[in-house]
A protein has these predicted regions:
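C-terminal, non-catalytic tails of nucleotide-sugar-dependent glycosyltransferases
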Residues: 28-29, 43-115
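Histidine-centered active-site/metal-ligand motif
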Residues: 38-39
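A short, conserved alpha-helix in the catalytic core of glycosyltransferases
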Residues: 1, 6-35
Length: 115
């Protein structure tokens, strides 16, 4: 499928969709470098009564095992110019250290939800 309901109304839904594409073997991601999106004062969510904002960053890390920032940095390389289809990330010391921090966050989140 496309966008997941668990990220509605859109917090971290784009990285989640990109992760689905990555897992299907898609390696061409253009237009994800530094860009700005204007939401015009949250007109979509502001009108809803009893609106509850989702915690997309937490949902993403529980679903995929690492943060959306980690995915964008090591997989999508969102700070780099597009040259060719992406390859698997370089799994160096920085990669494993950041992945370790993501795993610690998951453990912390599990601990908090059991209280």
């Amino acid at each position: 499928g496309g966008f997941s309901e668990e990220f509605n109304p859109g917090m971290a839904s784009d990285p989640d969709f990109n992760m689905k594409l990555w897992n299907k073997g898609i390696r061409i991601f253009k237009g994800i470098n530094d860009f700005k999106v204007y939401h015009f004062s949250s007109t979509t969510t502001r009108k809803k009564i009893n609106f509850k904002r989702n915690k997309g960053d937490i949902t993403f890390i529980k679903k995929w095992g690492f943060s959306h920032k980690f995915f964008k940095k090591y997989y999508l390389r969102s700070k780099s110019l597009y040259i060719e289809p992406l390859k698997e990330p370089d799994k160096n010391l920085f990669y494993y250290f950041d992945l370790f921090l993501c795993k610690l966050k998951i453990i912390f989140l599990i601990f908090l939800t059991r209280r």
